[in-house]
A protein has these predicted regions:
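Short edge beta-strands and adjacent turn/loop segments
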Residues: 16-32
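A short interface-forming secondary-structure element
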Residues: 34-47
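Short polar/acidic secondary-structure junctions
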Residues: 11, 24-26, 61
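Histidine-centered active-site/metal-ligand motif
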Residues: 30, 49, 65
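C-terminal structural segments of small proteins and small subunits
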Residues: 54-83
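Short loop/turn motifs enriched for small/polar and acidic residues
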Residues: 24, 36, 70-74
Length: 83
């Protein structure tokens, strides 16, 4: 998979939300994802990750070796000072 394919899948689920994707190693199989969405309100961190992993369940292991996920609500993101 490439960055555009990952963004396309995420945008289909997180419509009009903020999404950033980075190829962590430049190898096309390790990615860092930042998703800022109010769909995460009252959702645990584990469940946020599950939501995102479910979008890629057919690509994990075969095309994606690792995903680093940062998932925030809009309010949580506004409170971040180090990003």
């Amino acid at each position: 998979m490439n960055i555009d394919e990952i963004k396309q899948r995420l945008n289909a689920y997180f419509i009009n939300d903020k999404i950033e994707v980075f190829d962590s190693r430049g190898t096309g199989d390790h990615f860092s994802i930042i998703v800022i969405s109010n769909k995460f309100i009252n959702v645990s961190l584990v469940d946020r990750h599950r939501m995102i992993y479910s979008i890629f369940e057919d690509k994990i292991v075969t095309d994606i070796h690792a995903l680093q996920i940062q998932a925030y609500t809009l309010e949580e993101w506004k409170g971040k000072k180090d990003i």
